[in-house]
C-alpha cells in the first residue's frame, strides 16, 4: 500500500513520539531532528525532508553512539520514495529529519541523487556555474568539499560574511539562534517552523551556518523548498 509523504511522516512521528499507552502520553523521541547548527536533537516536530549521513551510527538500543556521521555522504531525501517502508533506526541507516531544505543545506546536506535526481542534478549544475567548472561535480567531489566546510573537528564550522552578500535561504547565527534570510527579512528557526520575523540588518558581519559553496549554489539560482511557515 502506498502512503503519501505527509501520512508517512505522521507514521514516523507517531512511532518516535508516542509510547505504548497511546497518543495522550508522549515518550522520549529519537535524537534524529537536525538543526541548522548540525546538532541532532530529540523533539517531536514534523518536517518536510529526511536524510542520512552515509550509514548507521546509532546503537541497537536506538540511541546515538559517540559518532555523528558514518561517512562524508550527507544527503537530504524526500519522505516517500517508491513506497518504501523503513524501520526507523533499524539495521542499516540512521535516518534524520529536517524542518525543510534550507535547514538541511545549512547543516551541510546536499540533495540525494537517487530519490531527488532532478534536484540533485540542478544542484550540481549550479555548483558548476558558481565555481566555473568544466562539468558538474560528482557526488563524492561535492561531499569532500562540504565535509571540510561544514565541520571544524566535530563541531559546526562558522563562516564570517557580510550579511548583504547572503542569498535567500542562507542561515546566520545571532546570539546562538539560527535565522534564515528571506529578502529583507530574518526568520527565526524553531523545530516547529519559522517565527519572529524581523528586518534584515545591513552592513554588518555575521556568523554564517550555511557552507560557503552552498551559499554560492544558492546565489547561482538553486531554489530550495521552504517550510510553509516561511510564507506566513
Which ranges hold each PLM region?
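Mature, structured domains enriched in cysteine- and short glycine motifs
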Residues: 2, 9-232
Amino acid at each position: 500500500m502506498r502512503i503519501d509523504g505527509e501520512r508517512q511522516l505522521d507514521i514516523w512521528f507517531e512511532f518516535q513520539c508516542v509510547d505504548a499507552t497511546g497518543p495522550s502520553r508522549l515518550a522520549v523521541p529519537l535524537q534524529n531532528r537536525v538543526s541548522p547548527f548540525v546538532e541532532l536533537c530529540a523533539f517531536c516536530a514534523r518536517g518536510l525532508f529526511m536524510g542520512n549521513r552515509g550509514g548507521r551510527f546509532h546503537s541497537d538500543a536506538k540511541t546515538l553512539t559517540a559518532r555523528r556521521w558514518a561517512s562524508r555522504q550527507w544527503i537530504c531525501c524526500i519522505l516517500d520514495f517508491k513506497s518504501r517502508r523503513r524501520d526507523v533506526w533499524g539495521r542499516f541507516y540512521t535516518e534524520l529529519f529536517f524542518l525543510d531544505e534550507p535547514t538541511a543545506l545549512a547543516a551541510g546536506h546536499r540533495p540525494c541523487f537517487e530519490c531527488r535526481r532532478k534536484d540533485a542534478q540542478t544542484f550540481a549544475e549550479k555548483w558548476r556555474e558558481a565555481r566555473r567548472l568544466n562539468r558538474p561535480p560528482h557526488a563524492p567531489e561535492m561531499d569532500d568539499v562540504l565535509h571540510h566546510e561544514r565541520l571544524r573537528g566535530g563541531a559546526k564550522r562558522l563562516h564570517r560574511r557580510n550579511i548583504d552578500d547572503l542569498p535567500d535561504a542562507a542561515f546566520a547565527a545571532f546570539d546562538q539562534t539560527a535565522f534564515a534570510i528571506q529578502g529583507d527579512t530574518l526568520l527565526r528557526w524553531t523545530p516547529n517552523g519559522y517565527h519572529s520575523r524581523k528586518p534584515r540588518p545591513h552592513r554588518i558581519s555575521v556568523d554564517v551556518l550555511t557552507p560557503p559553496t552552498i551559499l554560492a549554489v544558492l546565489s547561482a539560482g538553486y531554489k530550495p523548498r521552504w517550510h510553509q511557515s516561511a510564507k506566513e
